């Protein structure tokens, strides 16, 4: 049985990966946990604890080899393999995500777009045709789907999510304005963009009130 890793640790791993990539681009070959802590705004001890969950990777007196740590964290995050993605909801948000080419650099390949709006049928985004939802079962029969991105309106999202689960899809990146409640064997990441904006608003107001 694999060791259970806390979600707080997992949330920090992509940040480590991004920063290590920046260090590689800058030609940095090694870095200490103290130097990492300044950038990450967590303690050096926390960084060591986080990485020790997966084996450590550092050497006392040397620090971390940036290239090696970058590659190992990439493996931890599953970036050493391809993930096939479909986008369910081909409106503005869905099309924006389909147009984001950097996903492919991380191995996230958008292979299908689906919607419930007949006006979108047959259109394409970056060469990917938009299909209607009733075509989804046939698509899934012939194409491996690892992740579904859900960008439908709230009132249609739950039914679509249930359909995705019935078709055997076990990971959903949910941008609909509700938290999905799905079986335990389905991995769901609920993303509420307005939450981040409200946090920003809070910090603006607090700063203004303190001036």
Outline where the language-model segments fall.
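Hydrophobic/small residue at the entry helix of a nucleotide-binding pocket
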Residues: 93
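Glycine-rich Rossmann-fold phosphate-binding loop(s) that bind the pyrophosphate
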Residues: 90
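NAD(P)-binding Rossmann-fold cofactor-contacting core
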Residues: 104-126
